[in-house]
Design a protein with these regions (language model features):
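Motif-centric detector for short Cys/His coordination patterns
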Residues: 1-85
Length: 85
């Protein structure tokens, strides 16, 4: 387990993380793909290089800059043509 990133808390509103010594709250409003994830998968988070974290089983990556300044990165979902099949 990489000690540079740890899950501190999981609740109904989101996830509290410690990344490189700083704490961040990830609201499910900003990361909805983590809301229905298994707790064991959410707990398995690791550094992905120096500038990002990842949840390998969930295929989710987040840049640390997004954690520091979430207001700069609005959540925009794009539909693919397969969504209509």
């Amino acid at each position: 387990m990489n000690t540079s990133v740890n899950v501190l808390m999981i609740n109904a509103q989101g996830i509290m993380l410690s990344v490189l010594g700083r704490d961040y709250f990830l609201s499910y409003n900003r990361v909805p793909w983590l809301k229905e994830a298994r707790i064991s998968n959410v707990l398995n988070v690791r550094m992905a290089g120096r500038n990002a974290i990842e949840w390998p089983e969930l295929d989710v990556d987040l840049e640390i800059e997004r954690l520091k300044h979430p207001e700069r990165y609005p959540l925009i979902m794009k539909r693919s043509t397969l969504d209509f099949v």
